């Protein structure tokens, strides 16, 4: 046929059997990729430290999505929360991966069957004897079935009526686990961070889909609407399908990047805005202040801060710190976190507590500034010693650690103080193992960043695809040159104003 590569899909334009075949093959490829990727990730995933080396630090992409839907155990005998599991059951990580691969194989065989047996009676219009599809009816069927699936997920899986529930956690990502949810039917259900909204919205959207599907199955579109929207053209289906996909891709890119109940930080890592707003730092200080108010010592209060919470408050876990084209997991960047050294508190020789100004997200280097409680700069690490007024040596800065591995250890040596001041720019200080993975020390993004970038990019691409195919189907007759009014519109002298049919010249 000699088609260029970008026009090869024309071969299924008027061939419903093979159109179905290529879609089944596409499903086979998607399911096969998902299952294979899951097995690869399970082969390289280390579940030994869910606090300091969670799945998102290791660059896992499909494991978080399985976990979000209620899969937490492996046939390897481990669970996502740590410890050993004796009876993981059929629906383990490996079980889900295997089911996807088996489904992929069945779809592969079905695609071959439909490619070979393309000339089925069901695809022919009995009145004309030509191949045709009742597209409005097919739309109704798909809408009804997707509504049933949507309703079933919300009413059974998420609520635990028949299923495990989904991953639910507290606002600081500390106590997450899979649990059933009650639907949130009030205004709170519209809060993107309220998990109950997932159940209620799926139930509501599923109900709407079922009703809309039944409507489209029982009511035929008016003739003018059918012709106006080109409902008989398969490219109309392509255009509107692309619209649905790009809209969904934009939505999930937003919920992933900005955070929501559907993208828990325990599974996908923190968002960049939690670093920008000092979200975890504020919670840590709130807990410390509460402990000090109960007459606990600094050492006692900081020792009670969960290592998991401290780890979130580290810039290396900010998905916006890794460049989009730096391949590899976060562990391949700054290394595998081994332990929290503790919280450093800096003081000058007058006993004032000093706070290190934290590095903003989009800086690679940042001056080391130590400010007091009023925000006044009291010390720094100068670029030029000759002009320094606030150097660590001149101000007499010391550092003491509370909590973590260096609990109650203090340093007054200027070189050591400056080392920890530089590291405090990056949030809480952790010991990082760079040797095991030969980590290069350059920050990487988390799966949250990769997912967002991929979906936003493809959404933009698909947006243009929607415009392209929508224009092709709406103006098909014009592009093909078969519009009955086309000749008259461009004929010189036919209209007083070129192309305006209201100004047609009258024959004398």
Curated annotation (Swiss-Prot):
Belongs to the PsbB/PsbC family. PsbB subfamily. InterPro entries: PS_antenna-like (IPR000932), PS_II_antenna-like_sf (IPR036001), PSII_PsbB (IPR017486). It is a multi-pass membrane protein. Pfam families: PSII. One of the components of the core complex of photosystem II (PSII). It binds chlorophyll and helps catalyze the primary light-induced photochemical processes of PSII. PSII is a light-driven water:plastoquinone oxidoreductase, using light energy to abstract electrons from H(2)O, generating O(2) and a proton gradient subsequently used for ATP formation. This is Photosystem II CP47 reaction center protein. GO terms for cellular component: photosystem II; plastid membrane; thylakoid membrane. PSII is composed of 1 copy each of membrane proteins PsbA, PsbB, PsbC, PsbD, PsbE, PsbF, PsbH, PsbI, PsbJ, PsbK, PsbL, PsbM, PsbT, PsbX, PsbY, PsbZ, Psb30/Ycf12, at least 3 peripheral proteins of the oxygen-evolving complex and a large number of cofactors. It forms dimeric complexes. Binds multiple chlorophylls. PSII binds additional chlorophylls, carotenoids and specific lipids. GO terms for molecular function: chlorophyll binding; electron transporter, transferring electrons within the cyclic electron transport pathway of photosynthesis activity. HAMAP family: PSII_PsbB_CP47.
């Amino acid at each position: 046929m000699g088609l260029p590569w970008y026009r090869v899909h024309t071969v299924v334009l008027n061939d419903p059997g093979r159109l179905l075949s290529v879609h089944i093959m596409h499903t086979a490829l998607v399911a096969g990729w998902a299952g294979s990727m899951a097995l690869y990730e399970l082969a390289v995933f280390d579940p030994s430290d869910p606090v300091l080396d969670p799945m998102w630090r290791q660059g896992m992409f499909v494991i978080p999505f399985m976990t979000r839907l209620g899969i937490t155990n492996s046939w390897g005998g481990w669970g996502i929360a740590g410890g050993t599991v004796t009876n993981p059951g059929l629906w383990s990580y490996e079980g889900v991966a295997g089911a996807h691969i088996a489904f992929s194989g069945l779809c592969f065989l079905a695609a071959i069957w439909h490619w070979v047996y393309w000339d089925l009676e069901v695809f022919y219009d009995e009145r004309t004897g030509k191949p045709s599809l009742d597209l409005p009816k097919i739309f109704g069927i798909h809408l009804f079935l997707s509504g049933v699936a949507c309703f079933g997920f919300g009413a059974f899986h998420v609520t635990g009526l028949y299923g495990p529930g989904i991953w639910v956690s507290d606002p600081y990502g500390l106590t997450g686990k899979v649990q059933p949810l009650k639907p949130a039917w009030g205004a709170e259900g519209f809060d993107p961070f309220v998990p109950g909204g997932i159940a209620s919205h799926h139930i509501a959207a599923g109900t709407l889909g079922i009703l809309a599907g039944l409507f489209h199955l029982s009511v035929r579109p008016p003739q003018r609407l059918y012709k106006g929207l080109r409902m008989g053209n398969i490219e109309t289906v392509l255009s509107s399908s692309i619209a649905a996909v790009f809209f969904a891709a934009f939505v999930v890119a937003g919920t992933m990047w900005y955070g929501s109940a559907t993208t828990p930080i325990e599974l996908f890592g923190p968002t960049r805005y939690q670093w920008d707003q000092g979200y975890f730092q504020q919670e840590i200080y709130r807990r410390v202040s509460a402990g000090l108010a109960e007459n606990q010592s600094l050492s006692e209060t900081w020792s009670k801060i969960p290592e998991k919470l401290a780890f979130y408050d580290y810039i290396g876990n900010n998905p916006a710190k890794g460049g989009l084209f730096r391949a590899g997991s976060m562990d391949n960047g700054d290394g595998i976190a081994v332990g929290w050294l503790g919280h450093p508190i800096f003081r000058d020789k007058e006993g004032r507590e000093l706070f290190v100004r934290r590095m903003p997200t989009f800086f690679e280097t940042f001056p080391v500034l130590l400010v007091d409680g009023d925000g006044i700069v009291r010390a720094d690490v100068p670029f030029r010693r000759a002009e320094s007024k606030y150097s660590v040596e001149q101000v007499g800065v010391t550092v003491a650690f509370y909590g973590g591995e260096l609990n109650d250890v203090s340093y007054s040596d200027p070189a050591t103080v400056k080392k920890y001041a530089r590291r405090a720019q990056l949030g809480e200080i952790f010991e990082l193992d760079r040797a095991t993975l030969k980590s290069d020390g350059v920050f990487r993004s988390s799966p949250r960043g990769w997912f967002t970038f991929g979906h936003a990019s493809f959404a933009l691409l698909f947006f243009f695809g929607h415009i392209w195919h929508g224009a092709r189907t709406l103006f098909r007759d014009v592009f093909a040159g078969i519009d009955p009014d086309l000749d008259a519109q461009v004929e010189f002298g036919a209209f007083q104003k070129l192309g305006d049919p209201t100004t047609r010249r009258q024959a004398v």
